[in-house]
Curated annotation (Swiss-Prot):
GO molecular function: holo-[acyl-carrier-protein] synthase activity; magnesium ion binding
UniProt cross-references to Gene3D superfamilies, sorted A to Z: 4'-phosphopantetheinyl transferase domain (3.90.470.20)
One GO CC term, this protein: cytoplasm
Keyword Metal-binding: yes
Signal peptide: none
SUPFAM superfamilies: 4'-phosphopantetheinyl transferase
Name of the protein: Holo-[acyl-carrier-protein] synthase
Gene: acpS
Source organism of the structure: Vibrio parahaemolyticus serotype O3:K6 (strain RIMD 2210633)
One Pfam family linked to the record: ACPS
Required co-factors: Mg(2+)
Lineage: Bacteria, Pseudomonadati, Pseudomonadota, Gammaproteobacteria, Vibrionales
Localization (cell): Cytoplasm
Sites where the protein binds Mg(2+): 9, 58
């Protein structure tokens, strides 16, 4: 096994909350998958949830070496949690095709947040 890609991103929660306040649900829909939107709509701390997903997806796109560009969109990534609460990152669309071309067999995601910031790191492994 070898590391094929590494990406990290940090998001200021207040900045995401302000954008959400200005643009509302359309802003969230631009970032979140359908499954993530279903959970988002039930939460009280929507800005924090959105900031963590934003950081995770940015980190994943950086690990691919593209950023959110070259056909890779936020919707190419879905973040969920396993039965123990560990974050799980699923790739689809262009991101999935790029990962397959790179020889990615394992995707690792870590997300942390505190009062002001959410941070995520993604490792793509063969």
């Amino acid at each position: 096994m070898a590391i094929l890609g590494l990406g990290t991103d940090i998001a200021e929660i207040e900045r995401i909350e302000k954008a959400l306040g200005r643009s509302g649900e359309p802003f969230a829909q631009r970032i979140l998958s359908e499954d993530e939107m279903a959970k988002f709509s039930q939460l009280k701390q929507q800005g924090r949830y959105l900031a963590k997903r934003f950081a995770a997806k940015e980190a994943a796109s950086k690990a691919l070496g593209t950023g959110i560009a070259q056909g890779v969109t936020f919707h190419d990534f879905t973040v969920s949690n396993d039965e123990l609460g560990k974050p799980v990152l699923m790739l689809s669309g262009v991101a999935q095709k790029m990962a397959q071309t790179m020889g990615v067999n394992h995707v690792h995601l870590s997300i942390s947040d505190e009062r002001h910031y959410a941070v995520a790191t993604v490792i793509l492994e063969s």
